[in-house]
Amino acid sequence: MGLRLNELSPGVGAKKTAQRRGRGIGSGLGKTGGRGVKGQKSRSGSSIRSGFEGGQMPLYRRLPKFGFTSKMAMTTAEVRLSELSQIEGDVVSIETLKAANLIRRDMKRARVMLSGEVTKAYTFKGIKVTKGAKQAIEAAGGSIEE
């Protein structure tokens, strides 16, 4: 017999019919349609933005501001050791990382993180390296030039 496209149908219970609201008290959601009685939220077209507290000073304005966003972090890319295998050659610099599409073109700095294995000896020029990554690079025979 076999399976045919024109004989396919959804499994039993897979498609529930939508609950029609406000269509008689026998439906279980008649009259007020599950909205309760009166008030702003019972009216059509009403939507109260999240964080609105009825006019009192909201929590996000009662609490003090703190911290800042570092502009340096916005232009510093993070590169994993495992991603370095995509680079042609054994010299790693900002230019070679951009050429291999490992970092975005607008990045000015890069930092190499310890994640994965180093496959060969790389020479790093002008790139920051974490402590763990430095140990892994030197263990593989690589070097770091500031």
Curated annotation (Swiss-Prot):
- A GO molecular function for this record? structural constituent of ribosome
Q: How does it assemble?
A: Part of the 50S ribosomal subunit.
Origin organism is Psychrobacter cryohalolentis (strain ATCC BAA-1226 / DSM 17306 / VKM B-2378 / K5)
User: Compositionally biased, Gly residues: which spans?
Assistant: 24-37
Q: Which SUPFAM superfamilies match?
A: Ribosomal proteins L15p and L18e
CC terms in the record's Gene Ontology section: cytosolic large ribosomal subunit
BP-aspect Gene Ontology terms: translation
Q: Which UniProt keywords apply?
A: Ribonucleoprotein, Ribosomal protein, RNA-binding, rRNA-binding
Q: Where is this region: Disordered?
A: 1-55
Which family does the UniProt entry place this protein in? Answer: Belongs to the universal ribosomal protein uL15 family.
User: Main role?
Assistant: Binds to the 23S rRNA.
Q: Name the gene.
A: rplO
Official protein name in the record: Large ribosomal subunit protein uL15
